[in-house]
Amino acid sequence: MPRITLTNVTKQWGKFIGVNDLTLDIEDKSFVTLLGSSGCGKTTTLRMIAGLETPTKGEIRFDDKIMFSSEKNINVPAAKREVGFLFQNYALWPHMTVTQNIAFGLETLKWKKADISARVAEMLKTMKIEQFAQRYPAELSGGQQQRVAIARTLAPKPRVLFMDEPLSNLDAKLRGEMRTELKRLHKDMGSTFVYVTHDQLEAMTLSTKICLMNEGVLQQYAPPLEVYNRPANLFVADFVGNPAMNIVEAKAKKISPNVADIEIFGHHAVFQANDDFDMKSEKISLGIRPEFLPISDRGDLEGQAYSTLPAGMETTVKIKIADEILSSVVFGAIDYETDAKIRFSVAGNGILMFDRVSGLLIANGRVVFEN
């Protein structure tokens, strides 16, 4: 399976820039998710890698082989890139059985009949759809059709599998099941998967790395937990996480290589960073995940219950303090009366400090309030 390298890839239509100077290294056998909201450039990026869209400039390589180069005037057609596609629309032939749908691409590639039969049987078993071999697409559920589409795409043994929002047509339960299947399939197949979604849950649970984009610009390219715990900037911090990260404006004054005095919620506190850091401005924003706002009678801060959103296993509690509405997540079903007093703390060493002007991450650490 190839290592895919994009170097300074740009796609422009007139004055509109869809993807701007993107450099990306997709490692062999990785599962990379292109994540972002509609119009961010993620699907355009996938289509350029696959050969369905021609970049305006830049270079794309599969291992050492150039697939596209604006300087060298090279553009290898999609059909010769040995890739597979799985889209939101399964595009199964309605007049063909499951077996015939899976075999169709192999027949087009002039595989021998014996090899086709063996490969179809292998894919039916891999995708756990052997019992549906002689059924037609109309006789299958959405999840079953999805499995057939995956089997058909993987049958020719593509070097890379491209998936564009493949689970968006499924209900929530089926999406969860298919996430499990896709992750297992990636491990078993040993292929390189490139996956497009706007759903952060899919990106977090499936990926070896997330490529988060906004307005055609790469914001962060890192493993899911790094994106979650150390977002590169305020956009990433706000985009990833449900409930969303609390972003609170504050003022800070550095007093030692890894410590700053801060004013937050009308209180004085100290930010103790895990490492030395540099500050260019006193204007900062603190990023606090909801799980780092534990509710306790012995909490350092007092606020009011703004709303309570129980969801069974956990409850999101909205807390009003000063001019801020904060989200806290607590385990179990808890209900607070509106405007009831709540004591809580800012806990853990995963509190993030951002430069409010540039939006870039400065440091992570802990916040200690003065008594």
For the regions a language model picked out, list residue spans one by one.
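ABC ATPase nucleotide-binding domain
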Residues: 5, 25, 61, 343-345
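The feature captures the beta-strand-to-loop junction immediately N-terminal to the Walker
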Residues: 35-37
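ABC ATPase nucleotide-binding domain helices that frame the ATP-binding cleft
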Residues: 43-46, 148
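Helix-to-loop junction immediately C-terminal to a conserved catalytic motif
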Residues: 50
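ABC ATPase nucleotide-binding domains
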Residues: 81-84, 88, 92-235
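Conserved ABC transporter NBD signature motif
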Residues: 58-70
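Non-catalytic connector elements of ABC transporters
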Residues: 243-248, 254-371
